[in-house]
Curated annotation (Swiss-Prot):
Single GO MF annotation: DNA binding
Record's comment on post-translational modification: Phosphorylated by LytS.
Domain of life, per lineage: Bacteria
InterPro entries reported in the protein's UniProt record: CheY-like_superfamily, LytR-like, LytTR_DNA-bd_dom, Sig_transdc_resp-reg_receiver
Principal cellular location given in the protein's record: cytoplasm
UniProt-recorded name of the protein: Sensory transduction protein LytR
GO cellular component, one term: cytoplasm
Gene3D superfamilies from the UniProt entry: 2.20.25.10, 2.40.50.40, 3.40.50.2300
Protein encoded by which gene: lytR
Subcellular locations according to the entry: Cytoplasm
NCBIfam families noted in UniProt: PRK14084.1
């Protein structure tokens, strides 16, 4: 495969080129340090993948990615950056992967392998469509429909609809989804600010649940409820959150 590295820092380009040269799937590597040089190379060459930094001197890598996506045969875009805050936007642009600096050989190989497996398949440039049964209209935080979380220096993009519950214990926040569970040291409050209140309910100072995943509600001790969610996850509604919980589910 033919790769293009776009970064305005020579050391970053050299490091990435060194790691790519160790990968047998990469046959040829070219470099560019700015937008103009990148577009010129894309005009006269065909690349399978492009490693793209976000903070370029003359323009944002996000803006460049938008231009690349309009090309008839656009390369797979792998954002390679020191900043995690653009992860959601990157995946909205249908990026194949998002890698954080400093680079690691294993992580680079994972990204290359993704492209190698997908390069013969047509790229879907349509954005993810949110199921119609969820009404996000009153909550601006739901406009992205996804929650980025960082686990072991890797960012995972979780669809709101896949998240079953979030809970914290001994400083570790566990995010249970329909596919797997994730553990992170980020606070529950951090995630609460990013979740739409139209979909997620706080039932305890240490627990937030997705109301679309509530299967049954049982009366529990001290006039509280016990919830059974998707995959048989069970959580208790704290007495101090009972009133709000009933209101949000229309139980009053």
């Amino acid at each position: 495969m033919k790769a293009l590295i776009v970064d305005d820092e020579p050391l970053a380009r050299n490091e990435l080129q060194y790691l790519l040269n160790l990968n047998d799937a990469i046959d040829e590597i070219e470099e560019a340090e700015n937008i103009e040089e990148t577009l010129e190379k894309l005009l006269y060459n065909t690349f399978d993948l492009i490693f793209l930094d976000i903070n370029l001197m003359d323009e944002s890598g996000i803006d460049l990615a938008q231009k690349i996506n309009k090309m008839k045969r656009s390369p797979h875009i792998i954002f390679a950056t020191a900043h995690e805050k653009f992860a959601v936007k990157a995946f909205e642009l249908n990026a194949t992967d998002y890698i954080l600096k400093p680079f690691e050989k294993e992580r680079i190989n994972q990204a290359v392998n993704k492209v190698d497996m997908a390069k013969d398949k047509p790229k879907n440039k349509d954005k993810t469509i949110t199921p119609k049964y969820i009404d996000y209209s009153d909550d601006e935080r739901a406009q992205t429909h996804v929650l980025p979380i960082e686990v072991d220096e890797r960012i995972h993009i979780l669809n709101f609809t896949d998240i079953i519950a979030l809970s914290v214990n001994n400083g570790i926040t566990t995010i249970d989804t329909t596919k797997q569970s994730y553990e992170t040291t980020e606070t529950l409050n951090h995630y609460e600010k990013k979740l739409p209140s139209s979909l997620f309910i706080k039932i305890h100072r240490a627990t937030i649940v997705n109301k679309e995943h509530i299967q049954t509600i049982e009366h529990w001790f001290n006039y509280t409820y016990q919830l059974t969610l998707t995959h048989e996850f069970k959580y208790q509604v704290s007495r101090s959150y009972m009133k709000t919980f009933k209101q949000q589910l229309g139980l009053q």
